[in-house]
């Protein structure tokens, strides 16, 4: 649950005194592998400029506004830690994950320092495309639209790979369970996407999950994390092999 996860993180931040310490504490509790670094320790406000030129502040308000999003930016310039910038500069692979395009993914790119660090790295950029469009954010978006939008917010380096679903999604079931997170299955316009200089990696990535609690049962569509992990690792290993044998 997204909201519950946010509440747990906020509670831990209050206990630990900083976002980084909170993440370290939760990582130990959950026995997480790898390193998780916050985008910033600053309190920043996400701002959306809508297609009617209205300025809307706050993630929730941006998504709920009845017009399409034209652009997003921060009201304040975020301070980025040297540790995070160094991790980006020395990375072999930069993964832009699935999630709300304008209010979850792109906000991580809204910093000059982050863009510069990405440009200085030798990493390839991989985008894992969502299964569905999101109401209020990506209505009518195809895979190529996601790539074009991301490239607008990146610096000199652009998306190199996209992982996209080619598995069939039951349209009736999808309509029945459409909600604020998922609307229409995203169409892969492969030829148009490849013309953007992106290598398209595909598979049947659909995983249907039943959420049940005391009050109701809900069906949600998710990525098959086993297949997704395999594809990401394959891209990473292929690129590492290429660098080694240059």
Could you tell me what each predicted segment is?
Residues 140-246:
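C-terminal functional extensions of proteins
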């Amino acid at each position: 649950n997204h909201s519950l996860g946010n509440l747990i993180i906020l509670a831990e931040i209050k206990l630990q005194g900083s976002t980084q310490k909170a993440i370290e504490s939760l990582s130990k509790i959950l026995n997480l592998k790898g390193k998780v670094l916050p985008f910033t320790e600053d309190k920043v406000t996400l701002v959306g400029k809508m297609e009617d030129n209205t300025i809307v502040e706050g993630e929730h308000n941006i998504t709920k506004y009845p017009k399409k999003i034209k652009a997003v930016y921060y009201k304040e310039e975020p301070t980025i830690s040297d540790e995070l910038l160094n991790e980006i500069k020395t990375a072999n692979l930069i993964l832009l994950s699935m999630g709300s395009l304008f209010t979850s993914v792109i906000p991580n790119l809204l910093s000059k320092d982050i863009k510069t660090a990405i440009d200085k790295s030798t990493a390839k950029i991989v985008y894992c495309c969502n299964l569905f469009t999101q109401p209020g954010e990506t209505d009518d978006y195809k895979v190529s639209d996601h790539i074009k939008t991301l490239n607008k917010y990146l610096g000199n380096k652009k998306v190199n790979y996209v992982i996209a679903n080619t598995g069939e999604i039951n349209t009736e079931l999808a309509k029945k369970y459409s909600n604020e997170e998922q609307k229409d299955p995203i169409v892969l316009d492969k030829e148009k996407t490849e013309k953007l200089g992106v290598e398209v990696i595909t598979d049947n990535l659909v995983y249907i999950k039943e959420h049940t609690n005391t009050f109701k049962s809900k069906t949600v569509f998710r990525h098959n994390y086993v297949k997704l992990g395999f594809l990401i690792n394959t891209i990473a290993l292929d690129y590492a092999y290429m660098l080694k044998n240059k």
